[in-house]
Amino acid sequence: VQENDLLISITADLGRTGIVTKEIAEHGAYINQHLTCIRLKQDKLNPLYVAYYMESDAGKEQFIAKNQSAVKAGLNFNAINSLKLMVPPLSLQNEFAAFVERVDQQKQTVQQSLEKLELMKKALMQEYFG
């Protein structure tokens, strides 16, 4: 795989996405039959924008509609190739992706703060009540 490749789960957890990071690409990685790799034209599509779109309700609905089996989830090449994508100008995609990254970073910071507070609370509870 290469940096910024879009990976999509095509079995089991249908439609989950991921972006190949520089670190992963530099160390070398391979995918198996449970993933598909899409190499986007980055002058037209921001990989992070596409990943978030695919995980949105609109994207998930497409995966559900194209699922080929009621027993075991799965998509083939034709199903993946027929997925529709709303494509705003690249500048808006980049703006959206940057905003979502900032929000995700802030969420992570808040989550870490909550975990620290919970540890402090437990320590105080232990100290006061044994």
Question: What are these model-derived regions, one by one?
Answer:
Residues V1-E3:
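Residue-level recognition of short, solvent-exposed, well-ordered loop/turn junctions
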Residues L6-S9, D13-I31, L48, Y52, ...:
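Short, ligand-facing micro-motifs at secondary-structure edges
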Residues S82, M86-G130:
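Amphipathic alpha-helical coiled-coil/heptad-repeat segments
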Residues S9, T36, A51-E55, Q126:
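Generic alpha-helical structural context detector
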Residues K22, L40-K41:
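A structural micro-motif recognizing beta-strand termini
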Residues D13-L14, K41-K44, S56-D57:
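Short, charged/polar surface micro-motifs in flexible loops or helix N-caps
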Residues H27-T36, L45, Q68-N94:
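A short glycine-rich beta-alpha junction/loop motif
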